Amino acid sequence: MAKTIGLLGKKLGMTRVFADDGSVVPVTVLEVGPCPVMQVKTEEKEGYNAIQIGYDALPERKVNKPAKGHQEKAGKGYFRHLREFPLESVADYELGQEISVDIFAAGEKVKVTGTSKGKGFQGVMKRWNFAGSRASHGAEKVHRSPGSIGHATFPGKVFKGKKMPGQMGNERVTVSNIEIVDVRADENVLVVKGQVPGPKNGLVMIRKTS
């Protein structure tokens, strides 16, 4: 995994923009940072280089004692979300330093990580894109069933990983090589091409690819 810097933000929603040739480009608008550096880890002390950043300010009354002791060291208040980014070098970062959206540039490719929308308990046709059984010609009450899920006496079990009905969504998803369309540093806004995981106001992590 590339050791690159990133930021935290939230998904504001989707819209569209028009390219120079007149084509319509669907985009997602993200509110990103600014994120203060809450901790700097060094190879000498912790065994690896990394920085920890904070996002989404919290009032002091909502922070427990251990979290308060940790976050007070940066002198930037308290935050709901903390994320760590392993880096090759931390020489350019110091405790309390604010990292803003201007570390990104239009045309750059990034990775976006979020929590996908929860869909609840779903069948195999929705969850795994199964074709289902026949609509008629002898098919009865099995139109959306998965069909066979294994063998007979041998091996006498259903193998692990078999695609079956179950909980769908509400899991960590990363989408790579998303192109940045626009960076609005004065508004802390990042406009990226296409869609990103999660609902409106959902937490997202944006990382550089190199």
UniProtKB/Swiss-Prot annotation:
<keyword id="KW-0694">RNA-binding</keyword>
<dbReference type="InterPro" id="IPR019927">
    <property type="entry name" value="Ribosomal_uL3_bac/org-type"/>
</dbReference>
<dbReference type="GO" id="GO:0003735">
    <property type="term" value="F:structural constituent of ribosome"/>
</dbReference>
<dbReference type="InterPro" id="IPR000597">
    <property type="entry name" value="Ribosomal_uL3"/>
</dbReference>
<keyword id="KW-0687">Ribonucleoprotein</keyword>
<comment type="subunit">
    <text>Part of the 50S ribosomal subunit. Forms a cluster with proteins L14 and L19.</text>
</comment>
<dbReference type="GO" id="GO:0019843">
    <property type="term" value="F:rRNA binding"/>
</dbReference>
<comment type="function">
    <text>One of the primary rRNA binding proteins, it binds directly near the 3'-end of the 23S rRNA, where it nucleates assembly of the 50S subunit.</text>
</comment>
<keyword id="KW-0689">Ribosomal protein</keyword>
<comment type="similarity">
    <text>Belongs to the universal ribosomal protein uL3 family.</text>
</comment>
<dbReference type="GO" id="GO:0006412">
    <property type="term" value="P:translation"/>
</dbReference>
<protein>
    <recommendedName>
        <fullName>Large ribosomal subunit protein uL3</fullName>
    </recommendedName>
</protein>
<dbReference type="GO" id="GO:0022625">
    <property type="term" value="C:cytosolic large ribosomal subunit"/>
</dbReference>
<dbReference type="InterPro" id="IPR009000">
    <property type="entry name" value="Transl_B-barrel_sf"/>
</dbReference>
<dbReference type="Pfam" id="PF00297">
    <property type="entry name" value="Ribosomal_L3"/>
</dbReference>
<keyword id="KW-0699">rRNA-binding</keyword>
<feature type="region of interest" description="Disordered">
    <location>
        <begin position="139"/>
        <end position="165"/>
    </location>
</feature>
